[in-house]
Structure formats: C-alpha cells, structure tokens
A protein has these predicted regions:
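Non-catalytic, conserved peripheral segments adjacent to functional cores
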Residues: 1-86, 103-135
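Asparagine-centered strand-capping/turn motif at beta-strand->loop junctions
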Residues: 98-101
Length: 135
C-alpha cells in the first residue's frame, strides 16, 4: 500500500479572517486559496494587475463589491450558497472587496488564481477607504 501524504496549509493571518493557501500548480502556474471572513467583516480592496480571481462561495452568505471605473460606483453582487449564484470571476485590473453578510457565522471563499500571487502583482487598500482611493 502506498504511503499517505500529509501536508500543512500555508496560513496567512488577517484580522478579518485568515487565508489558507492550499495548492500551487507549478505546471499551469495557478494557486488555490481558501479565504474565510469573520461575521459582519469586509476584506479588500484588492486589485490584481494580471491575475484573474475565480471566486466560489463555499459556505455562508456574502457579497462581492466591485468598483465600476466608468461610473465610479460600487456594484454589489450578493452570494448565498443556498439561494443565489455562488461563483464570480473577477478579471485583472478591477478593484474588489469581499463582505460577510452574516451576524454569527463566517463566510468561506475558494479562490482559484490564474497565476502565482505576488505582492508586485497586486495592490491592496483598506476596505473602509474606498472613497479616498477611487478616482
């Protein structure tokens, strides 16, 4: 019988909920993350220069906030594992944030990134500073 492999997730600590890197595919250059968001918290703003985020809500109810550059307004896409769509593809060069709508349970997203995450490839702003950085 072959031996079982046991691996640890890389955990990226965040005050509004942790991120768990679960896989990096070197042959196709993709990464997969699990992103949990604590009740009534937001994460973002995030802007990827080249990567696409394929976000799947796998637990809870949440919404994705997207900045529309043309109108300078926030588009809100509600996600609920039981009622609404639970997948949103965020293309490169688009500011977005994640918001947990629950009062008492976390929201969990699976994020399949189209490339390798790098601090040089993405920009981040505090989620509560939207009006200060959108032009």
């Amino acid at each position: 019988m072959s031996r079982l492999l046991k691996k640890r997730f890389k955990i990226i600590n965040s005050k509004n909920g942790n991120i768990y890197k679960i896989k990096y595919f070197s042959k196709i250059n993709n990464e997969i993350y699990i992103n949990n968001i604590l009740p009534k918290k937001k994460k973002g703003w995030i802007f990827h220069l080249t990567n696409t985020c394929n976000l799947f809500l796998i637990y809870g109810k949440a919404r994705i906030l997207l900045v529309d550059k043309k109108t300078n307004k926030i588009k809100k896409i509600k996600l609920n594992i039981n009622k609404y769509c639970n997948n949103v593809v965020v293309p490169p060069k688009k500011w977005f944030a994640l918001e947990n709508l629950s009062n008492n349970s976390e929201a969990i997203f699976l994020n399949i990134l189209s490339g390798k995450h790098s601090s040089k490839e993405s920009l981040k702003k505090d989620v509560y500073l939207y009006k200060k950085f959108v032009t």
